[in-house]
C-alpha cells in the first residue's frame, strides 16, 4: 500500500501486487490502476481468501509476465511478504513454500529476458515464523538455482488454481488490457 502510493502516478515503475482483498488498509482494489500518465502501471490482483499456489502462479504468468515483458524493467524489486503462507495466522491464503519458489521462478524468467537477471528481494512480512523461514528458504533456493521450476512444473501448478479466483484474474485482465497490448 505504501509502495503503491509512492509510484501511483509514476510510469517509470510498474507496480504489481497479489493480495487478499478486502483487507487492511483497504487499498489494492481492481479500480486502482494508477493515475495520469501512469494509468495501467499499477496492477492489483485482489484475490479472495483461500487462494492457492496455482492461483498465484496463474496471476504471475497470465497477468504479470506479459505486461512485464512489454514493459522491460531494468530491475525487478520484490517486496517479499510471506503472510500468504497457508498456516499464517493473518494471511488467509494457502500458499506453500513450493508456491513461493514457483513465483520466484516466474520472476527470474522475466528478469532473464528483460534485465540480465537483476532481481532484488526484500523481506517484508509473515507471521508464522516457521512458515516464513521455510518459504524464504524455498525462494532463495530457487533464486540460487538449487531447485529449478520448469515450465512443465509451473503449468501443472497453474492447473490447480482455485475456481473462486478465476473470475478475479479475468477481471484484472479486462481492466488493465486497455493500457497494455498484450492480452
Where do the language-model regions lie?
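A general "terminal functional-core" signal
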Residues: 1-183
